[in-house]
C-alpha cells in the first residue's frame, strides 16, 4: 500500500520509540480481519477501542512534549537577559550545560539564535508528528468504507476525532517566548552594527513608498510552520501584554486578540455587489472594536470602550487615486446617536484642539464623520453581518514597512438589519458560519523599485500558504449567510473552492523558475538558451530564493538534546566514570583539571538517535509515493500520479494550462490588454504571410502552364508535365494552411499562458528555430545543386554528371 510505505518513511524514529504515533501496522491488521469477516459487528468496535487507546497514549505524550519544549523555551528566555554585544568567544557545550542552572553570565547573540532555531526545529517536528497521526486516522476511517458493511457507524465514531484531541493543546506560549528571544537577539545584533558603522539602522532619506497587501489561506495543520518563518524576523506585536497576567491567573495564553466588526449594507446588498464587481468608488462601512484577550466573550463591550467608525473606498488604477481606509473612534454609548445623525461632534473637535491637532486634521475628521453618516442615510444602510476573529500581529515597533497578521477562529454571524434600533445585535441566537482556515495578510511598504526582503519572498512562495487575492471577510460572510436568497446576484470566486484540500502535504514540490530554461526541456535547448541569455546570477536563479534560508542544515536535534540535558542538570550530575571521560575527550573536551571544571566540560550522555531530521519529512514521503491522503466525499483516499493527475505538465502547444504548481485555489485575473494585442499582432503577421503563400499556390493551380517549366522537368512523364503546376500549387496551399494552424495554436497557447499568469516565457521558442532550420536547409540544398550542376562535370571529368 502506498500509504503504508509513506507512513514508514514519514515517522521520526526517536518519536516512534517514545510512543508518539498511532500504530498503523497493528490497526491495519484489524482492518484486514474486518475485510475477511465483513459481517462481524465486533470488529469495528475493536478498531474503535484500539484507536481510542492509542490516541490516549499519544495525547499524554504530546502533553509531556509540550511541557518539555516550554521548559527549554523559558530557560532560553531567562538566559536572553545576559545577551552581550561583544564578540566574545564561548564554548557552546558550556553554554548548553549552564542554560538552566542560573549561572549564565554571557550569551552571544549567534548562540542564542542557534538555541532558538533548535527549539523551533523540535517544535515543528512535534507538529509534523501530530499531523501524521491525524492523516493516519483519516486514512483508516476512509478504508473502513470499503471493509465494513455500513462504514464507521455508531455515535462513538462521531467523536473519534474529538476524543483526546492533541491539536487542542496550545503551543502559543512557546512561540511567544521564541518571538521575544528572536527580538532581543535582533536588537543586540543591530546595536553591534551601529557601534561598528556609526550609522543608525534603518536611516534613510525621503522616499516614495508603494503599499500593497496580499492575503493567503493557511490550513490549521500548517499554521505553526508559517509562524516559525515569521518570528525570527518580526516579533509578536500587541497593544496589551497579557502573558504575565495569563500566568498569574492560570489562563491559557494565545497569540491573538479578539477583533470584531459590524458591516453595514442595505436590503439589496448594494455595497456588497459594488465591492465584488470592483467598481470605481465602491464603498465599505463597518464599526470595529478590539476585545480583551483575557475575556471569553468576544461580544463584551462596555459603554466607554472605543468603537472605530471605518470606511474603505476602492479606486481603479486609471483614476490616479489609491484605495484607502479611514477611521475615527467614538465611545460605544455614542455610536447609536451618531448613526442616526443625532450626535453633536463639537466635544470631539474640542478634544482634538486640546491635543493641538492641525486645521487639516480637524477638517479631515469633520469630512470623514459627515461622509459616513451621509452614506448611511442616503443608501439606507443597516447592520447586516458581524465578523469576529482572533488576530495575531507581527511587526517591529512602529516600523510599517512589513506587517503580518494572522486571523484564526474566523466566524461570521448575522445581524438583525436594524430591527432592534441598535448599531449591533445583542442577542445570542444569530446564525453563525465558521471559516475553516486561517487568513494570513502580508502588508508591505517599500520604496519604488526596492526589492523586498528575501525571507518575505520565501514566505510568500512557500507551499504552506495558498494565495487568495482580494479575499474579503465581508464578502465571504454575505455569500455564506445570504447566498441562497434572491438578493444575492453573485458570489466570490473562492466560495465553490472551500472543499479543496490546501494542506502543504498534498502539494508537490515547487521548482524555482529558471528564466534561462523557458519551455526547453533538453540539454541542447538549455545550452542554447544560456548562450543567448547568459549565466549571471539574476538570470539563473529566482531573485531572493537563494538567499532566503530558513533553518539551515545544522544538527539542531543534538543541540536541543544538549540544552535539555543541561536544563535538567543531567550534564552536570553525570558520574565521572572512565567512559564519561572518554566521551568527553571524543567531543574535544579536556579530562584534566579540578573536579568542578571536569563537571562543566563533560558532555551529557545523548541518545544514539540524535540525528538531523527534516521538518518536512511527511511531505517528502507523500511526494515520493505520490500519495495525497485526504478523503473526498468521505469515501476513499486518493492517489494521483504526476503524469496524469491534478498537477500534470502543461500541454503548451495545444494551449491547455493545468493547475499551477503547488497552487490549489484558482484565481480569476485581470489581463493587460497590451499583452493580448501584441499576441494578436504576432498572429496577424503569420496570417498575412500564410495568405500570400496560399494566394500564390491558388494562382499557380489556376493559371499555371507546364509549357513554361524548366527543361529538366519537361523530360519527365506526361503526367508530371501536365500536372506539375497543380502539385506545386497544392504544396504551397498546404504550407499556407500549416502556417495558419501554427499561428492560431501559438496565439491560443500564448493567450492561455497570459490568462494563467504562469512564470514562463511568452515568446515562441520553436517557431523561429524550425523556420531558420528549414530556410538554411533549403538555401544549402539549392546552392549545392547549382554548384554541382555547374562544376560537377569539371570536377568529376564526367559529362553525364
Swiss-Prot record:
Molecular-function GO terms, alphabetical: ATP binding; metal ion binding; transferase activity
All ranges on the Cytoplasmic side of the membrane: 1-692, 745-768
Subunit structure as annotated in this protein's UniProt entry: The VTC core complex is an integral membrane heterooligomer composed of at least the catalytic subunit vtc4 and the accessory subunits vtc1 and vtc2. vtc1 is a small membrane protein without hydrophilic domain. Vtc2 and vtc4 are related and have 2 hydrophilic domains that face the cytosol, an N-terminal SPX domain and the central core domain. The central core in vtc4 is the catalytic domain.
Binding site for ATP: 215, 286, 288, 312, 325, 391
Upper taxonomic lineage: Eukaryota, Discoba, Euglenozoa, Kinetoplastea, Metakinetoplastina
Designated name of the protein: Vacuolar transporter chaperone complex subunit 4
GO cellular component, one term: acidocalcisome membrane
Protein localization: Acidocalcisome membrane
Annotated InterPro entries: DUF202 (IPR003807), VTC_Complex_Subunit (IPR051572), VTC_domain (IPR018966), VTC_sf (IPR042267)
Sorted UniProt keywords: ATP-binding, Manganese, Membrane, Metal-binding, Nucleotide-binding, Transferase, Transmembrane, Transmembrane helix
Organism in which the protein naturally occurs: Trypanosoma cruzi (strain CL Brener)
GO biological process: polyphosphate biosynthetic process
Annotated EC: 2.7.4.1
Amino acid at each position: 500500500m502506498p500509504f503504508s510505505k509513506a507512513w514508514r518513511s514519514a515517522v521520526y524514529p526517536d518519536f516512534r520509540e517514545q510512543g508518539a504515533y498511532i500504530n498503523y501496522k497493528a490497526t491495519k491488521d484489524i482492518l484486514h480481519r474486518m475485510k475477511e469477516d465483513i459481517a462481524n459487528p465486533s470488529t469495528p468496535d475493536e478498531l474503535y477501542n484500539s484507536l481510542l487507546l492509542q490516541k490516549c497514549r499519544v495525547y499524554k505524550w504530546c502533553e509531556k512534549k509540550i511541557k518539555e519544549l516550554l521548559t527549554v523555551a523559558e530557560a532560553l528566555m531567562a538566559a536572553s537577559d545576559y545577551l552581550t554585544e561583544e564578540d566574545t568567544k564561548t564554548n557552546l557545550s558550556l553554554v548548553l550545560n549552564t542554560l538552566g542552572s542560573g549561572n549564565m553570565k554571557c550569551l552571544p547573540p549567534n548562540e542564542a539564535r542557534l538555541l532558538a532555531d533548535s527549539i523551533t526545529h523540535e517544535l515543528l517536528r512535534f507538529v509534523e508528528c501530530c499531523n501524521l497521526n491525524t492523516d493516519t486516522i483519516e486514512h483508516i476511517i476512509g478504508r473502513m468504507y470499503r471493509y465494513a458493511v455500513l462504514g464507521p457507524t455508531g455515535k462513538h465514531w462521531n467523536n473519534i476525532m474529538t476524543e483526546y484531541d492533541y491539536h487542542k493543546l496550545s503551543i502559543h506560549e512557546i512561540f511567544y517566548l521564541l518571538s521575544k528571544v528572536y527580538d532581543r537577539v535582533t536588537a543586540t545584533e543591530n546595536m553591534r552594527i551601529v557601534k561598528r558603522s556609526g550609522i543608525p539602522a534603518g536611516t534613510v532619506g525621503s522616499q516614495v513608498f508603494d503599499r500593497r497587501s496580499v492575503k493567503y489561506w493557511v490550513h490549521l495543520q500548517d499554521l505553526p510552520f508559517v509562524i516559525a518563518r515569521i518570528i525570527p524576523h518580526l516579533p509578536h506585536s500587541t497593544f496589551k501584554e497579557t502573558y504575565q497576567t495569563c500566568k498569574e491567573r492560570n489562563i491559557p495564553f494565545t497569540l491573538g486578540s479578539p477583533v470584531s466588526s459590524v458591516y453595514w449594507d442595505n436590503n439589496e446588498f448594494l455595497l456588497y455587489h459594488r465591492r465584488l464587481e470592483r467598481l470605481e468608488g465602491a464603498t465599505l462601512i463597518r464599526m470595529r472594536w478590539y476585545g480583551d484577550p483575557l475575556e471569553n466573550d468576544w461580544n463584551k463591550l462596555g459603554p466607554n470602550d472605543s468603537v472605530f467608525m471605518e470606511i474603505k473606498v476602492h479606486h481603479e488604477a486609471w483614476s490616479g487615486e489609491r484605495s484607502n481606509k479611514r477611521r475615527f473612534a467614538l465611545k460605544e454609548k455614542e455610536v447609536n446617536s451618531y448613526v442616526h445623525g443625532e450626535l453633536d461632534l463639537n466635544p470631539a473637535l474640542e478634544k482634538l484642539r486640546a491635543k493641538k491637532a492641525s486645521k487639516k486634521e480637524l477638517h479631515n475628521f469633520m469630512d470623514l464623520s459627515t461622509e459616513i453618516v451621509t452614506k448611511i442615510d442616503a443608501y439606507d444602510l443597516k447592520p447586516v453581518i458581524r465578523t469576529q476573529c482572533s488576530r495575531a500581529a507581527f511587526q517591529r515597533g512602529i516600523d510599517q514597512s512589513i506587517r503580518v497578521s494572522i486571523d484564526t477562529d474566523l466566524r461570521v454571524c448575522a445581524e438583525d438589519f436594524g430591527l432592534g434600533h441598535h448599531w449591533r445585535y445583542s442577542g445570542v441566537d444569530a446564525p453563525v458560519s465558521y471559516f475553516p482556515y486561517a487568513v494570513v495578510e502580508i502588508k508591505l511598504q517599500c520604496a519604488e523599485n526596492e526589492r523586498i526582503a528575501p525571507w518575505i519572498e520565501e514566505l510568500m512562495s512557500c507551499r504552506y500558504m495558498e494565495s487568495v487575492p482580494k479575499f474579503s471577510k465581508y464578502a465571504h460572510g454575505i455569500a455564506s449567510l445570504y447566498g441562497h436568497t434572491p438578493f444575492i446576484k453573485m458570489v466570490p470566486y473562492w466560495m465553490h473552492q472551500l472543499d479543496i484540500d490546501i494542506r502543504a502535504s498534498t502539494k508537490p514540490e515547487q521548482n524555482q523558475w529558471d528564466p534561462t530554461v523557458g519551455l526547453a526541456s533538453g540539454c541542447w535547448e538549455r545550452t542554447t538558451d544560456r548562450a543567448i541569455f547568459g549565466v549571471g546570477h539574476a538570470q539563473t536563479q529566482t531573485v531572493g530564493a537563494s538567499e532566503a534560508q530558513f533553518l539551515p542544515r545544522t544538527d539542531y536535534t543534538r543541540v536541543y538534546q544538549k540544552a535539555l540535558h543541561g536544563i535538567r542538570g543531567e550534564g552536570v550530575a553525570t558520574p565521572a566514570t572512565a567512559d564519561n571521560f572518554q566521551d568527553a575527550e571524543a567531543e574535544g573536551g579536556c579530562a584534566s583539571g579540578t573536579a568542578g571544571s571536569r563537571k562543566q566540560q563533560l558532555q551529557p550522555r545523548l541518545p544514539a538517535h540524535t540525528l538531523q531530521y527534516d521538518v518536512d519529512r511527511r511531505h517528502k514521503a507523500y511526494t515520493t509515493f505520490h500519495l495525497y491522503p485526504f478523503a473526498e466525499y468521505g469515501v476513499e483516499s486518493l492517489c494521483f500520479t504526476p503524469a496524469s493527475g491534478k498537477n500534470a505538465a502543461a500541454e503548451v502547444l495545444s494551449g491547455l494550462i493545468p493547475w499551477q504548481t503547488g497552487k490549489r485555489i484558482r484565481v480569476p485575473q485581470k489581463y493587460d490588454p497590451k499583452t493580448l494585442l501584441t499576441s494578436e499582432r504576432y498572429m496577424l503577421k503569420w496570417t498575412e504571410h500564410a495568405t500570400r503563400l496560399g494566394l500564390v499556390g491558388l494562382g499557380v493551380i489556376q493559371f499555371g502552364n507546364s509549357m513554361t517549366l524548366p527543361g529538366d522537368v519537361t523530360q519527365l512523364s506526361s503526367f508530371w508535365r501536365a500536372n506539375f503546376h497543380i502539385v506545386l500549387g497544392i504544396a504551397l496551399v498546404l504550407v499556407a494552411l500549416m502556417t495558419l494552424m501554427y499561428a492560431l495554436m501559438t496565439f491560443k497557447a500564448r493567450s492561455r499562458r497570459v490568462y494563467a499568469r504562469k512564470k514562463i516565457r511568452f515568446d515562441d521558442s520553436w517557431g523561429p528555430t524550425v523556420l531558420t532550420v528549414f530556410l538554411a536547409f533549403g538555401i544549402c540544398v539549392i546552392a549545392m545543386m547549382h554548384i554541382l550542376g555547374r562544376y560537377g562535370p569539371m570536377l568529376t571529368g564526367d559529362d553525364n554528371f
